[in-house]
Each structure stands twice: as C-alpha cells, then as structure tokens.
Design a protein with these regions (language model features):
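Alpha-helical scaffold segments in soluble metabolic enzymes
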Residues: 50, 70, 74, 125, ...
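A non-catalytic, amphipathic alpha-helix used as a structural packing/dimerization or gating element
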Residues: 70, 125-128, 148-155
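Hydrophobic core/packing positions within alpha-helical solenoid repeats
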Residues: 2, 48, 68, 130-133, ...
C-alpha cells in the first residue's frame, strides 16, 4: 500500500543515517538499539529487498543503492566489530561471552545458549544479501561489483551446504570448529523463506518437513524440538533452571 511505502521511507530515512554513521565510525545522536549485533545490517538489506518488491527495483536502487553497496563493502572488508568473513565465504561471529542473536537470554551476564561461530540464519541472510545486491548492481551496469558479489555468493552457498546441512535433512543451528549444535531450532526456516537460498527445492522440503513435524504448534514454532537435548516443557525454580 502507498501509505506503507511512505512509512517505510520515513523510517529508513532515520535508519540510513544511523547505519551510515555506524559503518563510518562517526558520532551520531540517532542510535539504533544493538546496531553492533551481527544480523542488524543484514536485516536492513532484507528490509530494502522487500521495499523493492513494493515499488520497483529501479526505484529501490535509486533510493538505497548506495547504502546497500556501503553495507556489503563494510562486511566484505571485515570492518564489522563482530562479523568476520572467512575464506570459505561464510560469516563468523563470536557469541561465547555475549548473546548476539534473538536468543539472548542470559544468566550471570553470560548467554544461556552461546550461539557462536557460523550461525545458520546469519549466513542465510548473508547469502540472500549477496545475491540480491549482486543482481541489483548488475542491472545498473556495475558489472565488476556484481561479478564479485555473485562469485562470493556461489562460494558461500557451497560452504553453507557443506557446513550446515546434515544427513538427517535439517540444518545445524551453529558451527564453531568441531563444535556442531544439532538442536532442531526454528532458525533454519529462514533459509527456506528467503528469496535467495543456497538450498535446492528438495533440500528446502527436507528442512520444512523437520520444522513442521518437530517445531510447529497451534501457537507458532517452538524454539526447540522436544526430541532435542535440553528440551523441558515445564520450568520451575530459579533463573538458572
């Protein structure tokens, strides 16, 4: 709707300034809460991607093309305080000491679930962003950047499958070296939902089947499968429990 587009542009006008200043390490009175978290800039790209669907890719590129390029360059050059682009094309984030995703429950200042390393939804967002921005700049004739992003997307997509997809047909929640979290969690569903996914149709169906069977309830998705270790349907006692 027209009013939704206008509302988005109004909000993004504020966000754009805050993002620009964060990327360039400039002082800014416009603070976005938890801007430093690894997924915030990637969600900003996704939001602009939805805007492009509402208006047109040409208008989106005209209005936000420079911002998108700045974000991707910032991430590619590893200037983010807690996102590191590894040689396999995946983004690595450190979440051992501080909760860095939406699963941000803490006890005594430390995350209850220390999601760290290659985090599934962050790298799904990364792949989606590479493909979307790569296509967008290519349509504008910036072939060098388009080729760079598309080549990186191919590498990222292959590494994503090698790293996250397991023999049971679902995605690991996070991987840090030899530490692999096999918990069945809803974070993997983003890889099915995004416009650009490293998974093919068969792999998407496998993920969706697991999520549907183990996580879907009449109230929404569980944050953990009853079949996974650590699942507890009832919580009593102090915060630690």
């Amino acid at each position: 709707a027209i009013d939704e587009v206008a509302k988005f542009e109004s909000v993004m006008e504020t966000a754009r300034k805050a993002i620009h200043d964060f990327i360039n390490d400039e002082p800014n009175d416009l603070k976005i809460y938890e801007m430093e978290h690894p997924d915030v800039l990637l969600w900003a790209v996704w939001c602009i991607q939805q805007y492009a669907k509402m208006v047109s890719r040409d208008k989106c590129r005209e209005k936000y093309g420079q911002l998108l390029e700045e974000i991707m360059e910032y991430l590619r050059r590893e200037n983010h305080p807690n996102l590191f682009l590894h040689s396999n094309g995946l983004l690595y984030a450190n979440g051992t000491e501080k909760a860095i995703t939406w699963m941000n429950s803490t006890v005594n200042g430390h995350p209850v679930i220390p999601r760290t390393g290659y985090i599934v939804e962050i790298n799904a967002l990364w792949y989606n962003a590479l493909c979307f921005v790569g296509e967008l700049v290519g349509e504008a004739g910036n072939n060098n950047l388009a080729e760079t992003l598309q080549t990186l997307a191919e590498q990222t997509g292959k590494s994503f499958i090698d790293t996250f997809l397991n023999e049971y047909g679902y995605l690991l929640d996070y991987v840090d070296g030899n530490m692999m979290d096999w918990s069945v969690r809803p974070n993997m569903i983003f890889t099915v939902a995004f416009d650009y996914s490293p998974l093919d149709a068969r792999q998407k169906k496998g993920v969706l089947d697991v999520v549907t069977k183990e996580l879907l309830t009449p109230k929404g998705l569980r944050s953990l499968s009853p079949k996974s270790g650590g699942y507890n349907p009832n919580y009593v006692g102090p915060q630690m429990q």
